Amino acid sequence: MRLVTTREASRLTGLSTYKLREWASRRALIPADVPPKSQGSPARYSWQTILLLRIAVTLRDRFHLELQAHRQVLTGLHTSLRTTSFVSLWGKSLVIDPDQCWSWIDDADFDAVKGDAILIRLSPHLDALSQDFALPRPSRMPGQLDLFPARPIAGPPSPTPASIQSAPHQSHRGRKSAGGRRE
């Protein structure tokens, strides 16, 4: 399983490294999968923990919830995500009711929610994670998964045929002068 460092987790969640450390260590809301070995070394996070952190950021920023009051929900989600496959979460939403009970529902089943609840669509979060963790995305064909998830490749761009043709052609031979001699 691929784990990312605190710096990458900060980028993926939108949390500052200070806030991420506070949530993972000091307040112990969502602990890192691998705590730092020593002071100055980074903690490591799995896709499940990053997804949970993204959900927590959404609850805090969009719904203005105090996360300490919803610690039980976060703990239950963390436990559930440990045994849930990434692929099975596509097309699902998280539902949290006022009694702090939560469930995964299909995006098409919003009518099944009775009463008041907070709904968080998972697809935008999974989309971001699938790129950074090289996890599979849903296939356009039902029941078909990507054999090898595409990973971004970093490096200098290769020259295009147009840029090669537009480069001036340089000859290593001298030009002939009017008298037939090479210059």
Q: What kind of region is each of these model predictions?
A:
Residues V4-T5, L51, L65:
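An amphipathic alpha-helix/helix-turn recognition signal
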Residues A32-T58:
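Short helix-start
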Residues M1, V57-E183:
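Basic Lys/Arg-rich amphipathic helical interaction modules
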Residues T17-S41:
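Major-groove DNA-recognition helix of helix-turn-helix-type DNA-binding domains
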Residues M1-W23:
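Polyanion-binding surface elements
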Residues T13, R26-R27, F63:
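Residues at alpha-helix termini
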